[in-house]
Curated annotation (Swiss-Prot):
Keywords: Isomerase, RNA-binding, tRNA processing. Substrate binds at Y300, Y369. GO terms for biological process: tRNA pseudouridine synthesis. Responsible for synthesis of pseudouridine from uracil-54 and uracil-55 in the psi GC loop of transfer RNAs. This is tRNA pseudouridine synthase Pus10. It catalyses: uridine(54) in tRNA = pseudouridine(54) in tRNA; uridine(55) in tRNA = pseudouridine(55) in tRNA. Pfam families: Pus10_C (PF21238), Pus10_THUMP_arc (PF22023). It comes from the Archaea. GO terms for molecular function: tRNA binding; tRNA pseudouridine(55) synthase activity.
Length: 407
């Protein structure tokens, strides 16, 4: 049997709907001369099973899911998933018979047609690069139980909402609160008696105090906190605050009153934190917030206590500290690469409290560990306040007064 005879015999088993025929034959004359016939009123398309003729019902199914979820969006992307071997097998065979080598398959057609319907009927905007929601059209062989449309009973709709990103600044007004969630050291976050089955080492975190207000407002799933650096648990963040971006995952409500969010967080945190300067940003902003430590500068207020009395010459030498070579501190080497990093001090102001205690105001490049700048960290920080005075010192109190990052 020749290839032509084989193709002719195969065409007797197939018929196409107008849309599938038009996909394969873009030229009307070619469609008129197609070796595969057009379906009649009793037939179903050999490729799409008449799904393309019932796209209005697919749209209604999408609309029903949007209303059920009460999901808000302005931009969208349509995705398709076909788990139906009959469709994929027949499409491949018909492409071979008709010598079709284009890329306008059934998935492309559904995406294009449904996108057009959503734009026209809902006034939404198709966005391939940065959609607010992704609408997945899933097609399988077996029918779905709760699909109300017999013609497309094997179609189901899933909608995923992409994250929203809100930038702001937080002030941490008390000590003893970490910035982000800290899994319990006993159960590793699983929940145990030691952590009251919360899975967390600390009851409150900056992230939790914000997310417990923002999640109900957005109907989001969870949050991820992106800070411009972080202060230690025993350190306060004062001044104008530390820049952060909070990422809300799977939000159903995207536009919330940020002024009201600020009021809620500030009034419900029992004086532990305050947030300000809230605004919506794109996902690119979280990277610039997190990776800004080298370009940024910070101002600290530190209390340094010395083993022996401090002289006026010691104070003079401390104020002259400039370039610091700092090896990764012992206390954080378990989570940071063991490297020597060079950081610059812009200015140090020293105020004597008593003969063995100084108040330091330090303006320095981001990424400098202040506690180790004072103690020397077993000579891993060179020079240090301890080494320059030949007098061992410890930081007994530390506050961050300012965090500056480039816009």
């Amino acid at each position: 049997m020749t290839e032509k005879e084989y193709n002719t015999r195969q065409t007797q088993n197939y018929a196409l709907c107008p849309k599938c025929l038009s996909r394969i034959y873009r030229n009307p004359k070619d469609r008129d001369n197609s070796i595969i016939p057009l379906i009649n009123n009793t037939q179903k398309c050999s490729i799409c099973n008449n799904l393309l003729l019932n796209e209005d019902k697919i749209f209604k199914l999408i609309l029903k899911k949007i209303k059920m979820l009460k999901i808000e969006f302005d931009t969208f992307l349509i995705a398709t998933q076909i788990n139906n071997q009959t469709i994929t097998k027949n499409q491949k065979e018909i492409y071979k018979i008709t010598n079709y080598h284009g890329n306008n398959d059934i998935k492309h057609q559904i995406r294009r047609d449904i996108s057009r319907l959503i734009e026209e009927k809902l006034g939404k905007t198709y966005d391939y690069k940065n959609p607010e929601v992704v609408i997945m059209v899933k097609i399988r062989k077996k029918p779905y139980k709760h699909n109300p449309y017999p013609e497309i009973s094997n179609v189901n709709i899933f909608i995923d909402s992409n994250p929203i990103f809100i930038e702001g600044k937080y002030r941490k007004l008390v000590r003893g609160i970490p910035q982000t969630k800290w899994p319990c050291t006993h159960c590793k976050g699983k929940g145990c008696e030691a952590c009251d089955y919360t899975g967390q080492q600390y009851k409150d975190t900056v992230e939790d105090l914000i997310s417990r207000e923002i999640l109900p407002m957005t109907n989001g799933n969870t949050t991820k906190f992106h800070g411009s650096g972080r202060e230690d648990i025993d350190v306060r963040m004062l001044g104008e605050g530390r820049p952060f971006v909070i990422e809300v995952k799977h939000p159903f409500k995207r536009k919330i009153d940020l002024k009201f969010l600020r009021v809620l967080v500030n009034s419900h945190s029992d004086g532990k934190i305050e947030i300000n300067d809230l605004k919506y940003v794109t996902k690119e902003r979280k990277a610039s917030i997190k990776n800004s430590s080298v370009e940024s500068y910070k101002i600290y207020s530190a209390i340094a206590e010395f083993e022996n009395g401090v002289t006026s010459k010691d104070i003079y030498n401390i104020e002259k500290l400039k370039t610091i070579d700092q090896r990764t501190p012992i206390r954080v080497e378990h989570r940071r690469a063991d490297l020597i990093r060079t950081r610059e001090i812009k200015n140090i102001e020293v105020e004597r409290i008593n003969s063995k205690k100084l108040h330091l105001i330090i303006k320095c490049q981001g990424g400098l560990y202040i506690k180790e700048l004072i103690s020397g960290d077993n000579n891993r920080t060179k020079p240090s306040v301890s080494s320059i005075t030949n007098n061992q010192a410890e930081c007994t109190q530390l506050d961050v007064l300012k965090v500056h990052i480039p816009e």
